[in-house]
Amino acid sequence: EMVIRDWSSDVCSSDLDDGRTLWVYSGAHDMYFVGDFDENGLYQPIQSVGQLSYNSQSYAAQTYYYEPGKPVIRFAWNRSDIPGAPFNGSMCTPTEMTLKKHGDRYYLSALPIKSTENLVVKSDKLDDFTLTHCTHELGSKTCRISFTVKEGDLTCSLYGLEMKLDKNGLTCGESILPRLKNEPMKVDIITDTNSVEIYLNGVANTVIAHVLDEAKPTFTIHAEDPVEVQNLTVSELSL
C-alpha cells in the first residue's frame, strides 16, 4: 500500500513484501530518499539519495491518484521545448509507482500504467532470437516498444532517434540510464509525435524531445556482434 502527498517534496509510504513499511521522500528532478521515522517523529533515510529521472526535463509539478488496494498512479509533466512548436512541454504517460529492492538497496520504480494496453490497435511479438540487425516498419507515430537484453552492445533507432545499450546501461542524447548490476536490461519505450519516453527496468527513465522523422518510419536494432534479444514487442497505439 502506498499513500502520497502532492508537491515537489512528496512523501509516500510503501508496505513491502517483508511486512516492513518505508517512506519515500522525493523532490524536484525525481531525486528521492527512502527511510523511516524515528521515535521522535523525525525522518531518517536508510540509504543515500536515489534518482529516478535522468534528464533535466523532469518538472516538479505532478499529481498522484490512489485508491486503497490499487497502485499509486502519477501524472507528471515533461517540460522539454521544441523550437517553433506552439506549445511548451507535454504530459507524460501516467505511471504506477512502487518500491523495488535490489541487493541491499531500495529503488523507486515508475512504469506505464497497465491500462495503456487498452490503447493498442496492433501488436507484433517476436520470440527470443539472436541478431546483428533487424528492422520493423511502423505504421503509427504513436507506439510502444519493449524488449529485454541480458548482455551485449547494440544500437536502436526509433523514427530517427538513436539509443545505445551496453554493459553500463542505456544512452540517448544527454541522458545516461544506469543498469541494475547483474540484471537483464528491460527496456520500455513510448513515443508520440514530439517526445519519446524511455524506461530501463522501471528504476531509471528519461523523456526526450524529438520530432519524429517521417522519412524513417522504422524501429531498428543493430549490433556489431550477435546479441540475444528477448520478448520484443512492437505495438501501435490509438492516439
Predicted ranges, named:
Residues 6, 18, 164-166:
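Poly-acidic low-complexity segments
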